[in-house]
């Protein structure tokens, strides 16, 4: 886990218990866990009121440490890592890493804003990481999934659950398979329970609000089928035409929302703001209720839940 176990330096007891519970579940399955602190959960703010299982190793913020990854009681790889001491880390921590000659396979863990010079989040370059001779880099900090390098692999898996509408699309983690000769294969595993999505509709060809509503309902059904899970959707209306004026006024938006509500048996559209349509009835699922409650506390408009 390459930093930011928690999304802030406030680690509630409930969050700690939930995290520890999953770590114990992993331990029962024989899974080792390696953790470094990031900017949201730096070493100086880390709280561990709930004990973690012995199979969990949390890396120090004082120096780069190396810990064996055991498979069947034998060392399969060495894991290198260093934590953030405080929220801002302007040092290029990559320069502290160096693979040992005797390592069969080496994994580097770093919380970094790669390629952004002057960043307060351990800035470094691809060449800095490559020069360490590590065989794989497990990177944290960036919430989007991306792979800056494939030789060696430098991987940002992104986060496992989108937190707001800026984090749209599939979220999850990577299962990394290392072959007998050090070949690396990545498989993305989807883990998000709720997905943030954007839906764009061009209104140019519509002659009346009913045509717009039919198109939105059609696209919404397609999106449900595609993702197979609840979605929080930002509806973006683009283009010009007969409906442009109507959808730009509060009265017109209210009318469109009423038409959409009439088409939905289990969803209620709550409000509209400018070009954003918001869908707000809380479904029965506890996790969705919890998510919408959090969004409302922070006045984040939840758009369309489908």
Residue ranges and their predicted role:
Residues 187, 191-306:
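Accessory, non-catalytic peripheral segments of nucleic-acid enzymes
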